[in-house]
Amino acid sequence: MNEKYAALKSNVSMLGRLLGQTIQAADGDVILAKVETIRKLSKSARAGNQADRELLIEEIKNLPNHQLTPVARAFNQFLNLTNIAEQYHTISRHCESHVNELDAIGSLFAKLAQKSVSKFDTAQAIRDLNIELVLTAHPTEITRRTMINKLVKINECLSKLELSDLSPKERHKTERRLEQLIAQSWHSDVIRQQRPTPLDEAKWGFAVVENSLWHAVPEFLRELDEQVKSYLGEGLPIDARPVHFSSWMGGDRDGNPFVTHTITREVLLLSRWKAADLYLTDINELVSELSMTKCNEAVRALAGEEHEPYRAILKPIRSLLQETIEILDAKLNGQKLAVKAPLQTADQLWEPLYACYQSLHECGMGVIADGSLLDTLRRIKAFGVHLVRLDVRQESSRHAEVISELTRHLGIGDYNQWSEQDKIAFLTTELNSKRPLLPRDWQPSPQVKEVLDTCKIIAAQSKDAFGAYVISMARTASDVLAVHLLLQEAGCPYRMDVCPLFETLDDLNNAESVIRQLMNIDLYRGFIQNHQMVMIGYSDSAKDAGVMAAGWAQYRAMEALVKVGEEAGIELTLFHGRGGTIGRGGAPAHAALLSQPPKSLKGGLRVTEQGEMIRFKLGLPEVAVNSFNMYASAILEANLLPPPEPKNEWRALMDILSEISCNAYRKVVRGEPDFVPYFRQATPELELGKLPLGSRPAKRNPTGGVESLRAIPWIFSWSQNRLILPAWLGAGEAIQIAINEGHQALLEEMCREWPFFSTRLGMLEMVYTKCSVSIACHYDERLVEPTLRPLGEKLRAQLQQDIKVVLNVENNENLMQSDPWGQESIRLRNIYIEPLNMLQAELLYRTRQSELPAPELEEALMVTIAGIAAGMRNTG
């Protein structure tokens, strides 16, 4: 390994050694010896030793069933520990500058000064900075909350061990603690035994807020404030809220029958309870800190004659929080209380605390004001009284079904059979009407009642409790108007952001005309108060058309929507539904944001962060601060130094590449008669459905083929066997055809000068690096019937051909040569992933031999799936 990663290497080997000791103590020498043999053979096989490769396959074939789980768990744990060491390395004092831009904002300010961007414009852009991260449950977030807490503690130990002035006694104590944590992880269940409920998923999200984001937000704002102050001469306003959070956990009912209006209500109560609980800790700390006696008149008026005025103000806040917690607790435990929790708005906390803050500054105690008190004020702005705002997501057909059932009941026809024009006419008339639409004697079907009950829950809460109402599979203007009407009928007293999600290739191409149509309805313009949110779906478009065509459709849709927004004079927020993987839009955030169309980040950034990516990007306070810095610097750069408008010849070539790649992708996925049976045999797709991973079923339609599979299991399955097909199929082929037609020079120019195109190629390189032709081939040999194998050979040959094509256009010798850290990080994990792949192929072979496989085989299989997911990083 490269000498410059010596600190990381030594942490990985120390954690590996401690894990080895744990395995030996728990499972004996035999298992440890097996693990070591497999690790060494795998390393040698990776280096190209064919004889050792054969030995490795035999070694795994000969493992008795009862040894499979401990061996699989060993490699799974190695990977988790490697991930921890790597994540820690990015925030450690030994971290190299190319690994992590430690001062992204500072570098940006230097660039702005060099390009003579006015300080006035910079100040304006900082004031408008708006990053909203939307936490979503991930059906494949395999790490349990129990494990996540242990990972945080392991990180703390690594941090302690890095201190050079640690006494031998302290060092020994920390190493001992590390050993205990690794042993605790080894003896805990890596995998959930039951599917998590939507409530479990929401609690997982709250754990991330409590363990990381709660600490990261004030820290990030403190750093940003200092940098802004030194560059512009004045810091951030005290009520700045550049970063805040929403969540889909407990609100996303699209295809998830387990998320009901009762669950949503419970999650809303739980998030308020958790917020009050966290503020109570803050207030208790402030009560002990703010013992000062000197204050200004405003605080004196609030505190009366009390000797310690600040404490006099804080104590009633403490009581308010305690009472809120008690009432919410009772409601969560099913008690029917008529009384409301006293803490209703953020101002109840903000106003008295801000008065204390001003008083401390006026009385010469600014240094005290700018400590814990300022942190709490920053949190109040970022988290409010709801901690995270809840998005509600539902599929468009469910809203149409409500109105259709209603119009049939009223005897005015079937809404679902009407033309789009008639639907719009009906909806706008009703939105304009003062009389209620829902008759009292109407008994809706249970499905329809559920949608109406959800709208009532929204209407009963304050506006701050919710983010957006997202309509999945949105196709028409009536899809958006229908939701506004249902919310109005439920008596919703505020305007909620109703956000259409355009997710297939056709829907992305039609997004502009749908929004334009809405903007031409005067009533609608008044309704939305000049603000429209639109969500761009990454996963379904890539599944539908392949990454190259989907990426270009997303770009063009964003560009067109920005134009519609400008023409209509409305503020547009684009909401990005990215996943962790390339096939679902996941790219290194900084590069991805800078490759978006000019002006597309003017309304700020709203982006989903999913399960396992939440853990990698936001799971530790220091890592979260880095992520916020990266997002902030990318948005500021995109808005202050916008990327060039693409040249017409770039666009024309992109149109061609998009069409060719889409056809090449669909020719295989839809047109190849052997494709579905091959996919089912070569990947663990069928087995994945049985795993207790997320609360949501893996298919929208339980009987359908590939098209009915959700985008996440579709990509997840392919990343398990290391072919990662959806993330590259079609792209290289299209580029090769363009080269054959004489476009090599133009492609090279696009690669050099157009961030959109160079980012696409960079993402492909990362996927190619994670693919393994030899592993994918091994799955075929072990699992696929001989008549289907030629398809696998064809796909692997295409992959190898595509890699050469992309390197040729980039004028590169090797994959990821411009990203040595990314390359190293993948290399480091591959050492442990490959044995897991070999084990998984063997386990799939054994479980498919019988109708009722032994439970120990299924458990071992789940461990390999979890391990490979942890190793591949962006699982789905």
UniProtKB/Swiss-Prot annotation:
The keyword Ligase does not apply. GO terms for cellular component: cytosol. InterPro entries: PEP_COase, PEP_COase_bac/pln-type, PEP_COase_Lys_AS, PEPCASE_His_AS, Pyrv/PenolPyrv_kinase-like_dom. Gene3D superfamilies: Phosphoenolpyruvate/pyruvate domain. GO terms for molecular function: magnesium ion binding; phosphoenolpyruvate carboxylase activity. Its cofactor is Mg(2+). The keyword Magnesium applies. The active site is at residues 138, 543. SUPFAM superfamilies: Phosphoenolpyruvate/pyruvate domain (SSF51621). One of its GO terms (biological process) is tricarboxylic acid cycle. It holds the Pfam family PEPcase. Belongs to the PEPCase type 1 family. PANTHER family: PHOSPHOENOLPYRUVATE CARBOXYLASE. HAMAP family: PEPcase_type1. This is Phosphoenolpyruvate carboxylase.
